[in-house]
Amino acid sequence: MTTALSNIAWISPFVSIAKGEDVSGNIQTIIKTIGLPLAGLLVFLMIWQAAASNINTSLGQFPGPGDVVTQTKGLLTEHFTEREKADAFYERQEKRNAARVKQDPTYVPKIRDYTGKPTYIDQIGTSLVTVLSGFILASLIAIPFGIVIGLSANLYSAFNPVIQIFKPVSPLAWLPIVTMVVSALYVSDDPMVPKSFVTSMITVMLCCLWPTVINTAVGVASIPKDLVNVSQVLRLSYMEHVRKIVLPSSIPMVFTGLRLSLGIAWMVLIAAEMLAQNPGLGKFVWDEFQNGSSDSLGRIMVAVITIGLIGFLLDRVMLMIQRKVSWDKSAATR
Amino acid sequence: MRGIKTLRRTFVKSALVLAAGMATMSAPLVSAEEWAEKEELKFGFIKLTDMAPLAVAYEKGYFEEEGLYVTLEAQANWKVLLDRVIDGQLDGAHMLAGQPLGATIGFGTQAHIITAFSMDLNGNGITVSNDIWSQMKEHIPHEDGKPVHPIKADALKPVVEKYKADGKPFNMGMVFPVSTHNYELRYWLAAGGIHPGYYAPHKGDTSGQIDADALLSVTPPPQMPATMEAGTIYGYCVGEPWNQQAVFKGIGVPVITDYEIWKNNPEKVFGVSKQWADKYPITHKKVVKAMIRAAAWLDADNNANRPEAVKILSKSQYVGADYDVIANSMTGTFEYEKGDKREVPDFNVFFRYNATYPYYSDAIWYLTQMRRWGQISEEKSDDWFMETAKKVYRPDIYASAAKELIKEGKLDAKDFPDFATETGFKPAQKGFIDNIVYDGSKPNEYLKKFEIGLKGAEKI
């Protein structure tokens, strides 16, 4: 337990103090790891508060930290009332179904999903599912593709221009095309997932493909010559070469790419949701902007902070996985 | 978690027993009940207070009582909304009265859209920016220090002429080419001698700015105040709460409500595609039933339910503007200049004066305005106007829904027109700002009364 705790950077000095080791040194570490970030945050909050009270928009004053807290509470309350309404909805539905079966025994009762509005928490969930689906799809394409072109200098030169051209394309440019193509190709009477989800997912995929492809290719291409020689001496087959030599040695670079990709995926998703009116945090922001109520700016600010926090958490999770699977622990510290 | 599940299960069980009991009790009464062919429906709307019948039918459970499970979804703009009804992503929607007509005759997107339910009367206003207002004000007669309403466009004319002389375009916003707002703004401008411009679809010109003194262009309703604040347009015609929003934000002044341009004018309708209506006739009837009840609730006891309705509308998933902004117009008042709040009890009418009944004469008025401004580029016979109105407006469906409500005892026969004798034509209507009388049975004769506008065989 203590070893697990002491692995987390900001907890380890506390653990050491508890053990009675090097008290003054550890206090310094604590100030550095906790005190400084806290001070930074405080200064930021103060500047924010001061700036907010000086900006007057036609929707009222710019929201300060206090308004954001109020709005967060409001959004949470809304979430719970909506859940209660959903429960009542299902109850009424059961009753109605039962009454109908009574009259019409051939009727097969069906429970329909709640028809009310998605709450803020639901929107966060939708956004997370969408971004992860898009990201996983992109990784499934990008890693194998990166390995293949990384292994062959010729293939790399052949595909490089395509990659370089598509890499800087903004999601906003892809979106109309993706929307039209998805509408044309994804036709079914009872679709498993909504069209809007597929559109967002593919847009995210197209935009976050490239960092992984490039980093994987570079990682694969820069495997130490010695390792390649070993593989040749052992006469490993292509697949075995990839599995035993290429993958393990290029993993730090692959993960650097994946982290960049996930960051881009998250940013792209919010833009795509805003523009295409696809459910999620982006749509939440847009809807609030359209509403133009005196709470709107505060709510948008809540979303901004949520988006930031989630982006940060996603990055940390990737970093953790990277540390777990990577042999070169020094390559992934930031 | 398990606790909640067991709780829910016991609840459902007792509910089942209860329901079974109720069903046996009421069985003979409803034995002939029909079931909707399609129970899960998705309706679109635009964030405007006159979507209220939809929100109320949902929140008050009227849809559910008809066995319909409805999802309401805000749409980005009128074009997206119409396209989604046409391609079936939406089962129906809150539409501009001109939209089903425009779509059916093929101005804009061609598709056969019908309506069996008129959602409300009045509810729009024309707002100008503070700057234009201060220029207009000197031309408006005052009484007790307050401007005399209704304000005619005559007061705006010198301002527009000044812009024209300076070579600057005078831009105004409306929400859609076939919107009520477009026709009302045009009517008001033309009544004051300002030419709002012609359309010429046969030449591919759908901008509506030929010969125009004031250039009108499309902006989605919720973006109107922001667009005017940015200086792109000097004024606009839009539904609530976007006129009152301008007052609250202090960026503009509403000059006239549409009630003053044409007393009790038909505004929004509930539109569905003809194909959808043919496929799901029972569902359609049930939807209309639920919405008639919602409209009746909105106007019941002299607007007694309006504050509750405003509370519903101010939720973020519906209109989402502040309670006070929506309440201003929904509870029968209208604020012109800041502080100049006046009674307009009929600003939003949802049910009284047979507001929900789809009158042919209403449809024909819109068609006459389409002809007047060139959206219909050729002369049409009076019969054509009649046939088109009958193709789109469906009082027969409305009547069957209303009759069921009367039979079920939910509403009274005196709440409705007498279906046995109703022709669908309102008697000749006065109450227009320019005092021209409208008789729906003589559209061509009506067109001849306008000084500005196409008539007879005229063509752009």
Question: Model-flagged regions — what are they?
Answer:
Chain B
Residues 2-18:
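N-terminal secretory signal peptides and thylakoid transit peptides that target proteins
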Residues 16, 90, 233, 292-296:
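Solvent-exposed alpha-helix faces
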Residues 22-31:
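C-terminal segment of classical bacterial N-terminal signal peptides
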Residues 33-211, 215-217, 227-264, 418, ...:
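Short, glycine-/small- and polar/acidic-enriched structural segments
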Residues 126-127, 269-272, 276-277:
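Short glycine- and hydrophobic/aromatic-rich loop-to-beta-strand nucleating segment
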Residues 181-184, 220, 224, 242, ...:
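Internal, well-ordered alpha-helical segments in soluble enzyme and binding-protein domains
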Residues 279-396:
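Secondary-structure end/capping motifs
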Residues 364-460:
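Conserved C-terminal helix/tail region of periplasmic/extracytoplasmic solute-binding proteins
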